[in-house]
A protein has these predicted regions:
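Short, well-ordered coil/turn residues at beta-beta hairpins
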Residues: 1-3, 177
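NAD(P)-dinucleotide binding in Rossmann-like oxidoreductases
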Residues: 149-239, 266, 289-291
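Rossmann-like dinucleotide-binding domain that binds NAD(P)(H)
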Residues: 84-177, 184-186, 246
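C-terminal helix-rich "cap/oligomerization" subdomain common to oxidoreductases
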Residues: 7, 18-19, 28, 228-292
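Beta-strand-loop-alpha-helix segment that lines the small-molecule cofactor/substrate pocket
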Residues: 3-64
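Donor/substrate-binding cores of folate-linked one-carbon enzymes
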Residues: 63-91, 95-97
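A structural signal for well-ordered alpha-helical segments within the folded catalytic domains
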Residues: 5, 9-12, 16, 42-45, ...
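Basic phosphate/pyrophosphate-binding loop/patch that engages nucleotide-derived ligands
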Residues: 49-57, 76-82, 105-109
């Protein structure tokens, strides 16, 4: 585990060995990294910069951006987004990345494209609800996101009553957009998100994973990687995952420092993505997981 509690993976060490083969052979091939580029910003940026220097086609990320959405909606291209509120579950280190990537996939479509992240903050416990009362995030957007869940764990209780040890990840973007991700174990067991654009138009959706065999959502992640192998061009931008990797590292640092705000000048970079999500075909019937 890292000092911030993140699970450490030898991604830089493995990529260094891959790079040596590239340099010795004088040729490169596409590289894909599951979930974040690395568990810390220093390694993630080194991997990204090295791939750019050697012209290595690089992709990373998870299945969240490409899986089913119910209803099948997306942020309109060049929308003037004002706020995003997302619901997540499990741990910040593992599923927090998924939630950040879900949000970033939507945020990068806004007017002007991605502009960078100014600061982040992680709050826990009662501070999560107090933040909503103070207007840090819009509780109405939270309820819109909660309304999309199919596996609603709270029953007749309120979200506040049902959530166990809640946490709130706040991402303040350089152009004024704010994203808030609430991890609500006990109240939620899925990912969902709601957003509001200028003029008050809101929308929301569930990001649905097939939690049974054959776990068909991974198919569409592999489809994206396969396309890169065939074309030599990344299917979606590595910058998205670089931004998400750096944001998670900073948010876990904030948690370590008892919710202090972390300025993120290193995440103040911009990118544009021409990638578009499309609804996958209906999933096949789920089959039981052995042993469960």
């Amino acid at each position: 585990m890292s000092p911030t509690g993140n699970i450490q993976y030898p991604k830089r060490r493995l990529f260094e060995q891959i790079v040596k083969v590239f340099e010795d052979s004088g040729r490169v091939v596409p590289v894909f990294m599951d979930k974040h580029i690395a568990d810390n910003w220093t390694d993630a940026k080194w991997i990204y910069d090295t791939a750019r220097r050697l012209k290595v086609p690089l992709m990373a990320g998870s299945s969240l951006p490409v899986l089913w959405r119910y209803p099948a909606v997306d942020v309109a291209r060049d929308a003037q987004l004002e706020q995003i509120v997302a619901v997540s579950y499990h741990t910040l280190t593992a599923y927090g990345f998924h939630a950040l990537e879900m949000v970033q996939t939507l945020a990068e479509r806004r007017k002007g494209g991605e502009t960078g992240i100014k600061w982040v903050q992680t709050l826990e416990g009662e501070a999560v609800w107090e933040a909503g009362e103070k207007g840090v995030y819009d509780p109405k957007l939270l309820e819109a996101a909660m309304s999309r869940l199919r596996d609603l764990r709270r029953g007749k209780r309120t979200t506040r009553e049902a959530a166990q040890n809640p946490s709130l990840m706040i991402i303040q973007y350089s152009d004024g957009l704010r994203a808030s991700i609430l991890t609500l174990n006990g109240a939620a067991n899925e990912w969902s998100v709601a957003w509001r654009a200028k003029g008050g138009k809101t929308d929301s959706t569930l990001f649905w994973t097939q939690e049974a065999r054959p776990f068909m959502h991974f198919t569409y992640l592999l489809d994206g990687f396969e396309k890169m192998v065939q074309t030599g061009q990344p299917t979606w931008p590595a910058e998205r995952t670089l931004m998400t990797s750096g944001a998670l590292d900073a948010l876990l640092t904030s948690k370590t420092y008892n919710g202090g705000r972390i300025e993120t000048p290193h995440l103040n970079f911009s990118y544009r993505s021409d990638w578009n999500w499309k609804q996958p075909p209906d999933p096949p019937p789920g089959r039981p997981i052995p042993g469960q």
